[in-house]
Swiss-Prot record:
Gene: hisB
Reactions catalysed according to its record: D-erythro-1-(imidazol-4-yl)glycerol 3-phosphate = 3-(imidazol-4-yl)-2-oxopropyl phosphate + H2O
Lineage: superkingdom: Bacteria
Coiled-coil residues: none
NCBIfam families the UniProt entry points to: PRK00951.1-2, PRK00951.2-1, PRK00951.2-4
GO MF annotation terms: imidazoleglycerol-phosphate dehydratase activity
Enzyme class name: lyase
Organism, scientific name: Streptococcus mutans serotype c (strain ATCC 700610 / UA159)
Gene3D superfamilies (alphabetical): Imidazole glycerol phosphate dehydratase, domain 1 (3.30.230.40)
Family assignment from sequence similarity: Belongs to the imidazoleglycerol-phosphate dehydratase family.
Keywords: Amino-acid biosynthesis, Cytoplasm, Histidine biosynthesis, Lyase
Name this protein carries in UniProt: Imidazoleglycerol-phosphate dehydratase
Claim: Protease is one of the keywords in the record: no
InterPro entries, A to Z: IGPD_sf, ImidazoleglycerolP_deHydtase, ImidazoleglycerP_deHydtase_CS, Ribosomal_Su5_D2-typ_SF
Amino acid sequence: MRQAKIERNTFETKIKLSLNLDTQEPVDIQTGVGFFDHMLTLFARHGRMSLVVKADGDLHVDSHHTVEDVGIALGQALRQALGDKVGINRYGTSFVPMDETLGMASLDLSGRSYLVFDAEFDNPKLGNFDTELVEEFFQALAFNVQMNLHLKILHGKNNHHKAESLFKATGRALREAVTINPEIKGVNSTKGML
């Protein structure tokens, strides 16, 4: 089974995270940041993976450290669970509509970290969640998985729908990329490693 457990403890956050790419249950997200819990649940469900997160952060300051550190821990867990990446598709792309919004995620589990984030939010907040943290999360995730991740809102108005389409699209693209393809012998790279 492709799975991992990560514990990350700093002066700002304490995070326990477990991930299994080969089963879909359980999904249980408890970060103390309601909107973020909702987004991570969508990410896991649409990525068809088990994800359990328990985070205690300095929410009396704001949710920045919690969101970023969960992104770091999730990225580390994905990298660990993927191991040598033998037989995986490597690439994944997904377009996800959410009412008036259309979001896209395209990624490469190349071992090279890069994020292109082309999404604008009309308001700085979604409830008590800072919309700038959407990009912060994906930055931490991409750099710790060591993947190229391109995210784009092609069109849309509602900020909730924009964020939701990006989290769902990333989960779906990741599912495509991590799927083991029997047609791929070894690692899907002319270098012989990812």
